[in-house]
Amino acid sequence: FDENGRNIYTEFDRRDIIPYRDYELIPIPTGYRFDLGGGYEVEAIPLRGHSAGQCAYLDHHNHIIFTGDIGGAGRKYEGDPCADNCTIETLWRDMQVVVSRLDEIEAMFPGHGMLDVTSSLLRYELDALDRIMKNPENADSIKTVVRNGQEQVQYAMNIHQGTAVKYNLTNVFRQTPYRR
């Protein structure tokens, strides 16, 4: 903000916008380590669920994991060949791998919410995901929300330390939609 309280970070000139250009997507294997120089490595660990190709990044030098958004399952878009990765089940499977490596992680930075939290939050989230997988309808809260002009029922399973995993019954399991 400037001295008059205006948010100067929302002001920009058209010349500030980077023009679009074609680029090549280069896939990386699970566990790929980016060498940032001087032996400083950051490892990509799949942590899908919120988005189909999401990774967490483990900073091996500082023992910090940057998880991105892991607060729920993302939308499954029709025709998306990776839609099954936007499920609670996928997040649950990937989170098991991350939690098995807690001895390498001292702190985590999620995509939003609390910052610089202890790695124990990963264990607490896995506990919440376990509860969802056992009984998706037994949520801590259920409410109707409007998304893109459509009503949907949103479920939430609380995570110890003050947040929740949000989902709906159509994006819990990978292969077959959840049916009552």
Tell where the protein language model's regions lie, with residue ranges.
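Short N-terminal signal/transit or membrane-insertion segments
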Residues: F1-D2, G38-Y40, I45-C55, N138, ...
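Intrinsically disordered, low-complexity segments enriched in small/polar residues
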Residues: N7, I18-R21, G38, C55, ...
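Polar low-complexity intrinsically disordered regions
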Residues: D2-E11, D59, D84, R180
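Accessory terminal helices/loops
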Residues: R93-R180
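Proline-rich intrinsically disordered, low-complexity coils
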Residues: P19, P27-P29, P46, P81, ...
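Flexible, acidic/histidine-containing loops and adjacent segments that form or flank the divalent-metal
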Residues: E24, T30-Y32, L36, E89, ...
